[in-house]
Amino acid sequence: MKKILVTGGTTFVSKYVAEYFVNAGYEVYVLNRNSKSQVQGVKLIQGDRHNLGGILKDMFFDVVADITAYNATDIIDFVNELGSFGQYI
């Protein structure tokens, strides 16, 4: 089963992305602060994208859907926090 990481995953676009991939049979992980209810069927990685402290370094994802980035610095910093991954969207 392919593993996908979705940043956010509780509101707006990221919620629907997480739901879509759960329904498509992916193993879906969401990264968020756990301040809102989670989509049924996802696995929560609780954290703030701006202060991850290496929690993703030992994980592999086939796809990373970074929905919550606002600028290039957000993207660069997040990619540097990731372990290995296949595709980054």
Regions found by a protein language model. Give the residues of each.
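Residues at the starts of beta-strands that form the adenosine-phosphate
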Residues: 3, 27, 86-87
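N-terminal Rossmann NAD(P)H-binding glycine-rich loop of SDR-like oxidoreductase domains
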Residues: 2-24
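NAD(P)H-binding glycine-rich loop region in Rossmannoid oxidoreductase-like domains
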Residues: 36-38, 43-87
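Active-site-adjacent beta-strand anchor residues
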Residues: 7, 31, 68
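Conserved glycine-rich Rossmann-like NAD(P)H-binding loop of the short-chain dehydrogenase/reductase
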Residues: 27-33
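Basic side chains
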Residues: 2-3, 33, 49
